[in-house]
Amino acid sequence: ITDHYKNRDVWTTLAVLSLLTNKISLGTGVTNPYTRNAAITASSIASINELSGGRAILGIGPGDKATFDKMGIDWDKPLSRVRETVLAIRAFLAKEQVSQAGFKGAQMSFTTSKIPIYIGAQGPKMLELAGAISDGVLINASHPDDFKFAVPMIHARAEKAGRKPEDVQVCAYASFSADKDPAKAVNASKKVVAFIVAGSPENVLERHGIGMDEARAISEAISRFDFKGAMDGVTTKMTEA
């Protein structure tokens, strides 16, 4: 479930879903290190894990600058922040005293079963970090070219960290749109595509032949809450990527 200030609260939603479902895994797709303290995030995901009978997954990534600008939050050192937060949360969940990332001996008062931590990643550095420290990687894409690029990088970094590549699960955060009328299906997907394009790093855009000027125009429209303008900027090439 997405963690975005414009949507329903992710933790409330996950709590309700924990009580209304029996088998599916439940998690954040994704939260971030900026809008919540790592100790609170650890407590929240541990609570969801208890409510759901051990079905929780914590998805965490760097978020996007455009959103944080609107919220008045400085998007500083995303790679370091994700790394520090993942390590701190893992320590909290193990009921260890945490004295890193600004904490001073903080500790949770309860434990729960192991919760996998997935890192949301697209760019090379974040993909490598995920290979080094995460239980899984949630890639905001579904095109085969993105995985041809990402998987070898993730596996190489996992091996460098002394891990087995198969210990890091690689997942696609896939978006789809279905309609009997193909044109309607494409049109319905454009808002989601616009947000993905606006939040994609330059190397991802280049891989799919999407110009920086096109992406910048969409990002600027979103920052103005001009969603129609953002959708109008979405091209066929973008929807197919």
Task: Explain the meaning of each model-derived region.
Residues 1-241:
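Active-site-adjacent structural elements that line small-molecule/cofactor binding pockets in enzymes
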